[in-house]
Amino acid sequence: MVMENPFEGKEIWFGVGSQDLYGEEALRQVAIHSAEMVDYLNNTGKIPAKIVLKPTLKSSDGVKEFMVEASANPNVIGVITWCHTFSPAKMWIRGLEVLTKPLLQLATQHHKEIPWETIDMDFMNLNQAAHGDREFGYIVSRLGIKRKVVVGHYTDPEVAEKLGTWARACAGWDASNNMKVMRWGDNMRNVAVTEGDKTEAERVFGASINTWAVNELVAAYDAVKDDQVKEIIEDYKAKYDVDPALLDAKYDSLFIAAKEEAAMVNMMRANGCTAGVDNFEDLGALPQLPGVGPQRFPSEYGWGFSAEGDWKTAVLVRIGAVMGYGLEGGASLMEDYSYNFTEGDELDMGSHMLEVSPSIGTIAKPKLEIHPLGIGGKADPVRLVFSGKPAKDAVVVSMSDVRERFRLLMDVVDVVEPQGSLKELPCARAVWEPKPSLKTAVECWITAGGSHHTCMTTSVGREAWEDFARIAGVELAVIDENTTARQFEKELELSEMYHRLNNQH
């Protein structure tokens, strides 16, 4: 059970701008330099998708053809542009206006240092990126096209890191636009923040969110073969510290939990879904509220999952899982539960009754246990119990439906070890230090209308989510080490004004 590589077969096209004015020899040098640069970037190991160099762009027709092909190719997740020489920006207009893939402008050059003693006009004519990129940047800004700008010599490690982070955001956007979310049941009764406009979500994020009757899941449960259940149980035994009682007197409960996982996975795969959500108020004839199965959605399958009908967080977890593929850490549903208000040691503890995923990293081998659950009205559910592994500069991200648009809200946090054993707490959890402080972070979070459900990512941090929000054209409010409550409130007011004016459809 291994998550499919979301970067397999995916490409980022590299378009280099120039013009015929400079002659064949100059254009030959442009092509040689561009190939050297792309080869170097591909060999850094920091960019998870392959960068593919396309023929030098020298005309309006060539640019449009390039952009149309990139937009139509399902394997292309993004486009990088760079102008080696001066490239008149009017020739980019028609192409840029038909581009539907994420755009990154790389402001770089082939040479690292100015050749002080030998530089002449031939060199100047060939190496004009410093003003070629400004010309290109002007037209992109004039057209109102959002893009990421990365500046630096192509051999600078920071350049490859930023390109790699952006490539991950592109993959997250690709996953979002190909996502189907399976809802078993509806939203938890009377809860506000987990509601949302599913039609608007498909317009904005490309994700198709639909409901399947819980009775269909029950039918899938009844159809599961014992061999599939036993295979899943063997996987449990290999990866977790299984309570001996579950292999003896409570084996039937373990079998049921594994069978529920198999049923959910079978339904998801049969319908091409990559995120799911259930609701403890709507379980039909299921024997248990699913626990260990949903916990494994992000870690084993790379899927999103959330609880209580909260499809918005399930979408975020899937996006986070894709963006973080191949990195240490992962993505999981998280819910704020309790504060530690000790002066100088302020902490937030997040958890959920069953569904927090070990994908975020665990301090010790997760324990597979069975405990009573006071809600849902079903048999005692089997769940993984662990504490999240410490991680610097992790993030918690929420999505709220604020009437005419969606708002993403993010807090940068440091996950830390719990200060006690938590031996009486029969569920998975994580403890973190919010930035800039617990009081400021919570005040800002509440002011922005952030959800109590979040997606925690320990694999990718702030920049990946900022890149994703820019690509999606969605508001993102950020709480970090530099945030003050007064400044945040003012920025939020300006952001609300901008997004309300900019989201008139």
Swiss-Prot record:
Binds 1 Mn(2+) ion per subunit. Keywords: Arabinose catabolism, Carbohydrate metabolism, Isomerase, Manganese, Metal-binding. It catalyses: beta-L-arabinopyranose = L-ribulose. InterPro entries: Ara_Isoase_C, AraA_central, AraA_N, AraA_N_sf, Fuc/Ara_isomerase_C, Fucose_isomerase_N/cen_sf, Lara_isomerase. GO terms for cellular component: cytosol. It is an enzyme of class 5 (isomerase). GO terms for molecular function: L-arabinose isomerase activity; manganese ion binding. Its cofactor is Mn(2+). The keyword Manganese applies. Mn(2+) binds at residues 308, 335, 352, 453. The keyword Isomerase applies. Pfam families: AraA_central (PF24856), AraA_N (PF02610), Arabinose_Iso_C (PF11762). PANTHER family: L-ARABINOSE ISOMERASE (PTHR38464:SF1). Belongs to the arabinose isomerase family. Catalyzes the conversion of L-arabinose to L-ribulose. This is L-arabinose isomerase.
